[in-house]
A protein has these predicted regions:
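A short, glycine/Asx- and small/polar-enriched loop/turn
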Residues: 259-265
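Nucleotidyltransferase catalytic core that binds NTPs
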Residues: 2-242, 251, 255, 275, ...
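Substrate/ligand-engaging "lid" and interaction regions
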Residues: 248
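Generic C-terminus detector
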Residues: 266-284
Length: 284
């Protein structure tokens, strides 16, 4: 496995792979890797001749500087895991390598067709501009055939599909396939997340109520309206000491707009467990 720190070296290595006709699978990450990431990487390794993983905590997608500073980082540990999984290349640049100071100062602009106006986009202004900025740059460097994203970040996944398939950038990504990968959960049911590292053992036990409530809502949805289930989920989670719902939206999986119909519905939740912000979702 080769660890690459510069765009120039990455482009050189990827060009060699393309010349050799090898299929390239790509998994973009921000590090602090866990079994959820590992499942994406295993799939990428199995389905492609070359597997590339990026490890980069992207500053342009954080609208909270404290959150950026607290985001867990351990490249040595991450690299050991990726080597064991059979990854060929790890791209681990610095922010200065990825962006000029001018790019850091300027607001990246993109037409999201309204996908960024709800949920995470509403709560974290500018977040998805940063996501598209870094993912498009990584795609341009890696030129993958397949790119793997987890469904836990459901809104992000919808926006990446839009970027590749329907946006003004689509022509750049002809032949690129976005692979949706299911949420990986701990034995307790808690959705795996790098942010879980910031939870105490007691907080992890408390946070299990998030997924338990979402799974229970599948039964509630059989006899109740969307609005009734939405309110019941919020009330149930908020009743747990130590948890506070930021939002729970039941949306159409394609448009991300709130829906009153169970067809194509996805429930997306963000909950604070102490100071740690956790997300999860469930398909109805």
């Amino acid at each position: 496995m080769q660890i690459i720190n510069t765009k120039q070296e990455l482009v050189k290595q990827m060009a060699a792979c393309v010349r050799q006709g090898k299929t390239i699978g790509f998994v973009p990450t921000m590090g602090a890797l866990h079994a959820g990431h590992a499942s994406l990487v295993k799939q990428a390794c199995a389905e492609n001749e070359v597997c590339v993983v990026s490890v980069f905590v992207n500053p342009t997608q954080f609208n909270n500087k404290e959150d950026l500073l607290k985001y867990p980082r351990n490249l040595t540990k991450d690299a050991e895991l990726l080597a064991d999984l059979g990854v060929h290349f790890v791209f681990a640049p610095t922010p200065d390598e990825m962006y000029s100071q001018e790019e850091m100062d300027l607001q990246f602009s993109f037409d999201f067709a309204g996908l960024d106006q709800v949920m995470e986009g509403k709560m974290r202004p500018g977040h998805f501009n940063g996501v598209v900025q870094v993912v498009s740059r990584l795609f341009d460097l890696v030129h993958p055939n397949n790119a793997y994203f987890g469904e836990k970040d459901f809104q992000q996944l919808a926006i990446i599909h839009h970027m590749v398939e329907r946006s003004s950038l689509s022509d750049r990504y002809t032949g690129l396939h976005i692979v949706d990968c299911p949420i990986v959960r701990e034995a307790s049911g808690l959705a795996m997340s790098s942010r879980n590292e910031r939870l105490s053992e007691q907080e992890k036990q408390t946070a299990v109520a998030i997924s338990q409530t979402l799974f229970a809502s599948l039964q509630w949805a059989k006899t109740a309206s969307v609005k009734e289930v939405q309110q019941r989920v919020i009330d149930t989670i908020n009743a747990v000491d130590g948890l506070e719902v930021e939002y729970y939206e039941i949306v159409d999986k394609n448009t991300l707009q709130p829906t009153n119909n169970w067809e194509n519905a996805v429930g997306c939740v963000t909950v604070y467990c102490g100071p740690v912000r956790l997300i999860d979702n469930i398909r109805y």
